[in-house]
Curated annotation (Swiss-Prot):
Monomer and homodimer. Part of the essential Sec protein translocation apparatus which comprises SecA, SecYEG and auxiliary proteins SecDF. Other proteins may also be involved. This is Protein translocase subunit SecA. The lineage of its organism: Bacteria, Bacillati, Cyanobacteriota, Cyanophyceae, Synechococcales. It is a peripheral membrane protein. It is an enzyme of class 7 (translocase). InterPro entries: Helicase_ATP-bd, P-loop_NTPase, SecA, SecA_CS, SecA_DEAD, SecA_motor_DEAD, SecA_preprotein_X-link_dom, SecA_SF2_C. It comes from Prochlorococcus marinus (strain NATL2A). Belongs to the SecA family. Part of the Sec protein translocase complex. Interacts with the SecYEG preprotein conducting channel. Has a central role in coupling the hydrolysis of ATP to the transfer of proteins into and across the cell membrane, serving as an ATP-driven molecular motor driving the stepwise translocation of polypeptide chains across the membrane. Probably participates in protein translocation into and across both the cytoplasmic and thylakoid membranes in cyanobacterial cells. One of its GO terms (cellular component) is cytosol. It comes from the Bacteria. GO terms for molecular function: ATP binding; protein-exporting ATPase activity. Its EC number is 7.4.2.8.
Amino acid sequence: MFGQLLGDPNKRRLKNYYPIVSEINILEEDISVLSDEELRGSTNEFRQRLEKAENSDKQLKILDELLPNAFAVVREASKRVLGMRHFDVQLIGGMVLHEGQIAEMKTGEGKTLVSTLPSYLNALTGKGVHVVTVNDYLAKRDAEWMGQVHRFLGLEVGLIQQDMNPRERKKNYQCDITYATNSELGFDYLRDNMAADKAEIVQRDFQFCVIDEVDSILIDEARTPLIISGQVERPQEKYQKAAEVVMKLQRASELGKDGIDPEGDYEVDEKQRSCVLTDDGFAKTEELLEVKDLFDPKDPWAHYVTNALKAKELFTKDVNYIVRNGEAVIVDEFTGRVMPGRRWSDGQHQAIEAKENLAIQPETQTLASITYQNFFLLYPRLSGMTGTAKTEEVEFDKTYKLKTSVIPTNKKVSREDWVDQVFKTENAKWRAVAKETSLINKQGRPILVGTTSVEKSELLSTLLAEENIPHNLLNAKPENVERESEIVAQAGRKGAVTIATNMAGRGTDIILGGNSEYMAKLKIKQVLSSRLVKPEDRHNPPVPLQRDKASGFKSLEVKAEAKTSNQSSSLNNLFPVILSDKTDNELGQLAAKLVKEWGDRALTLGELEDYIATAAEKTPTKDENILAIRRAIHSIKTEYEVITNNEEKLVTEAGGLHVIGTERHESRRVDNQLRGRAGRQGDFGSTRFFLSLEDNLLRIFGGDRVAGLMNAFRVEEDMPIESGMLTRSLEGAQKKVETYYYDIRKQVFEYDEVMNNQRKAVYSERRRVLKGQELKSQVISYGEKTMGEIVDAYINEELPPEEWELDKLVGKVQEFIYLLNDLKSSELIGLDTNQLKVFLQEQMRNAYDLKEAQLEETHPGIMREAEKFFMLQQLDTLWREHLQSMDSLRESVGLRGYGQKDPLIEYKNEGYDMFLEMMINFRRNVIYSMFMFQPTTKKVES
């Protein structure tokens, strides 16, 4: 009722933007007649106006005033360079982002293009803008694609990639707009705060950030902190032995209740992702290991056994990790991508290596860590966009203070969401998926099937191979990841079938009929790489990987040098048509010309890709080679478009893209993302979810109610079940999971908030030391505090002065400052506490000046170097130890809940005390090190 009275708050918010949209549209006419030079000149005009701002508040006010003109300029540049004009709703999206909100825009509504508006406007300040995406491929694509608009307007565009060295990173962070992934940004921040020298710092101060797929980064990944770690030696044979022992233990069929152990050696709680030994299990494990106590501090085993049990029960090969080149590589549970170089901490990765009989790598110790929540809160202004944010609106507001605005679609959504089909068993479900795929495939419609793991995608792939349905597989396996963009470029073609794990190709639109421009670039790359790219750097030509009945994966090898007409017909699955002789000859001539210019097989693949990306842009250039590649791309695209445009028409008439979901995800939001793949920009399309009562979601969170339903449904295995009660159970289960994970994220955030305040204090102290700001006065202040603390520790004011232990006090001072060895306790008689502090502080300052004079005589400038060295060394060592102590505290406070104490409050209080203790030790250690420091002089040998 209140909603009807007050109206939709989202609509009310959007209403404020329409007058500005009208203003931008009016400006369009005047701006469209400007020359390229004049359009580019707008950037300098805007910057000159911003120079007048005295502070960031004034700057923001001027940015708001510039917005209509700046957006109109970006729209015109985009038309000229990309051939894409921002719709009115995209302008609204840009305003929402500039204001530091989350813009919910449906799939295919051009979120990537929207980001050019606020990023250009905020880059005018010269303080840098970060555009964040979920993976390296998307960051590179957007920097090349959308970066054209910014470069055309005179801005510098940077890109951060996983394999870049610090020098390249620094250069790219200095650009006006930098494209990067969330993990690269986070790790660079942590590395900067471990730098030994100011020159090693790569990032500058944060200003404005736009996060693409904001829900994936700020919600899904918020449970996992970013950790930089160092190696710790632990006995490797213990991992191996524990892995062997747990294989002899029996899992309990159910969880224990009311403190009574179930039958079995250990119980597994999949919901909490934990494994616990029963009393019988403890006894049996101790017997098998031939030890008396698993918790014996001199020979601890409990940690190894628990991790081995988790590796056995909760970490599944080809779901949570894959084995590649003798290593266990993590698979990201949200994107389905492999994460090389990442490892589970706390000995879990070693337990998995032992389980798989792989070489066990050393265990690691945390050197620095931060959660994404606290990392992104470091930005003074933060914004984000996604196709699905409304379900998490409350969390965005509570955790990040971000409001969510739903942007209307440019065209009406024409997608049909068909009713779910639920089967009793998983086998029946997969047979039904294969059947529907076959049926829709015969209609000529493209199909996208979303699966939740590598294992499931390969199971379905086998079923489709048995039905002789050609298809592409997009999952975390390395041979597929490299072909991700090729697969997605073809996913909208007539009769195409694509199986994707957790929609790894997120961020790439599926265009009905196929993406002719992308396929043209691919064709150029295939032809030129054989003549221009070094053999060792060359990948196999891009060929569809298809299931073959007899041999699993069959990669159809094609010689890139071969004439197109002689190529295997399978290439028609990749490219829409065999090129005409005219275009084919042009490509041969182009290759010969470029070999003369750039050398025979002299380029790396990356260099060739950069040339092709530049040629694909519409940015003006005088480089003849780039222009020649540009003409070739245009010729190929024109021939391909004849087919893709016709296929688009046929596919649209047949009903558009059909999306099949094979399991409800733990979050409704991820289901909506998969559905949103169909029906982009008003296209026709349909979606259907196939589920089984054995699916993880229902099994773990659906509880006993679903078990009862399974028995109640005495129906054939292949008969789909449709029931209101079942649908409600499903939605109830999803809400339960969402709440459960929200609570976990909230807890992670609350606990890391304690660490965050400490981290900020340590990092700002560290940054000040690196910059070398007034180090001497800083060290002297440490010394003064230390002298005060010694007086407080040795003088009891409740006793008469004659009973004060002045000898011990002087002894302690001399431990720290050997230069005060002549100090006598008799000199302190008659002084009160404050006078003692003032006297000793004065003595310490004199001693420090004396120390400096002695050292500077033989080693000029060494004192400042020593101050910097010891301050960094002590801070890093103590912070590292403090992180370990805080981890241990976090584990131990959980038990205090049983004593009616709030674990979080206990953690805050004790953590604060531990931090104060750490800072006291830091000050004392620096003072001690500075006075004890004696530089050695190297003897010059004749």
